[in-house]
């Protein structure tokens, strides 16, 4: 009996040592970005932005090329971790590229773009998407960078993923601005480190800039993380608008705007998005979503072959636009969630010349 207890004790001690070593390695390798980091804006474009010219902007969470209509995901109540093999990742990326090319946008804001993650077969997805705007200027910022995510079973593994902005006009300057992380150690070490990717595009004939903010705010938190990140976003937008710049924030807010009447009720037991109070942005900004088509679907089960009636949909992708930007239209483009668990959202707008 004593011998058996000793063996069990040694096994438990060995497990504790292995876990401690693993936590030590992951802690030492934890991604710790500075509050503000300069991002290299690659591939200088030749086009310029002008006031009073119609422009088109698209935002799309592309689900790291692995969350097509076949996918379910464990964090949403499904069982999937690795949801696409290499062939399916390439199929999804090809569909995403085709859609973006057809939309012919001047600026594209993408979220969940993997550049070397196990979950998307170590694919650098920028290689497929970079020239969807010919001659585009582009910028990338990490939103998720972990040596190894050790959960669930099988574990997610290595992740390198982030926000990716493309512009027909030159991005003169870009920055990664860290957002508050709601998680403490040890969850923090293998979790997302969310940010704002701020790109500055000069407006010809003026000393103003179009300040583009690409974002993907907190999803699986108690709600405090989303709120803190939204407050920081609000401060940034007001500061830039106060300088006389044109300001647009677009992306996956993981929240519904309070001024949007969503026709998609949240069913019992499903993930619940937060709410952004539109009144908090009053006096300078408009919050825009198009509820005609859902921007996101639940990943509790695959969408292919499912009955849309009773399926969980959400409105969580959209734009916040300063008052000196005239909104000419907004549309959620219905792609049937074929290649991502989100639909792209298109904004047509004009930078107003007279902003006095």
Predicted regions: what they are:
Residues 68-73, 122-123, 150-154, 176-178, ...:
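Short aromatic-enriched loop/helix-cap "lid" or pocket-rim segments at secondary-structure transitions
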Residues 64-65, 114-117, 144-147, 171-172, ...:
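Solvent-exposed loop/turn segments at secondary-structure junctions
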Residues 2-131, 135, 140-160, 353-355:
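N-terminal, active-site-proximal structural segment of metallo-dependent hydrolase catalytic domains
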Residues 79-86, 113-115, 180-188, 216-224:
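Surface-exposed cleft-lining segments at the edges of enzyme active sites
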Residues 5-11, 18-45, 200, 235-248, ...:
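Metal-dependent phosphoester-hydrolase catalytic domains
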Residues 56-62, 92-122, 166, 199-201, ...:
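Active-site beta-strand/loop signature of hydrolases that rely on acidic residues for catalysis
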Residues 47-57, 69, 159, 163-173, ...:
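Beta-strand-turn-beta hairpins that frame and shape the catalytic cleft
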Residues 137-145, 174-180, 329-333:
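Conserved S-adenosyl-L-methionine
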């Amino acid at each position: 009996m004593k011998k058996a207890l000793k063996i069990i004790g040694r096994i438990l001690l060995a497990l504790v040592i292995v876990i401690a070593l693993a936590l030590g390695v992951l802690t030492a390798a934890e991604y710790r970005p500075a509050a503000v980091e300069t991002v290299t804006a690659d591939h200088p474009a030749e086009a310029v932005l002008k006031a009073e010219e119609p422009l088109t902007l698209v935002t799309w969470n592309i689900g790291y090329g692995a969350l097509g209509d076949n996918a379910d995901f464990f964090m949403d109540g499904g069982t999937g971790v690795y949801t696409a093999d290499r062939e399916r990742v390439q199929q999804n990326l090809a569909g995403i590229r085709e859609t973006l090319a057809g939309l012919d946008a001047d600026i594209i804001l993408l979220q969940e773009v993997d550049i070397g993650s196990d979950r998307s077969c170590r694919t650098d997805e920028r290689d497929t998407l970079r020239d969807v705007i010919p001659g585009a200027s582009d910028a990338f910022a990490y939103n998720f960078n972990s040596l190894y995510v050790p959960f669930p079973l099988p574990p997610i593994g290595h992740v390198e993923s982030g926000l990716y902005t493309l512009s027909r006009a030159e991005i003169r300057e870009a920055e990664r601005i860290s957002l508050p992380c709601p998680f403490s150690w040890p969850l923090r070490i293998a979790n997302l480190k969310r940010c704002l990717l701020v790109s500055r595009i000069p407006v010809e004939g003026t000393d103003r800039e179009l300040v583009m903010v690409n974002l993907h705010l907190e999803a699986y938190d108690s709600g405090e993380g989303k709120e803190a990140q939204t407050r920081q976003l609000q401060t940034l937008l007001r500061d830039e608008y106060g300088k006389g710049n044109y300001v647009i924030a677009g992306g996956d807010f993981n929240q519904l705007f309070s001024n949007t009447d969503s026709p998609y009720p949240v069913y019992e037991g499903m993930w619940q998005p937060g709410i952004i109070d539109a009144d908090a942005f009053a006096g300078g900004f408009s919050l825009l979503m198009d509820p005609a088509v859902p921007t996101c679907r639940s990943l509790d089960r695959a969408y292919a072959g499912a009955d849309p009636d009773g399926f969980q949909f959400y409105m969580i992708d959209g734009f916040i636009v300063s008052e000196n930007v005239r909104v000419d239209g907004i549309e959620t483009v219905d792609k049937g969630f074929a290649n991502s668990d989100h639909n792209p959202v298109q904004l047509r707008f004009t930078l107003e010349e007279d902003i006095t």
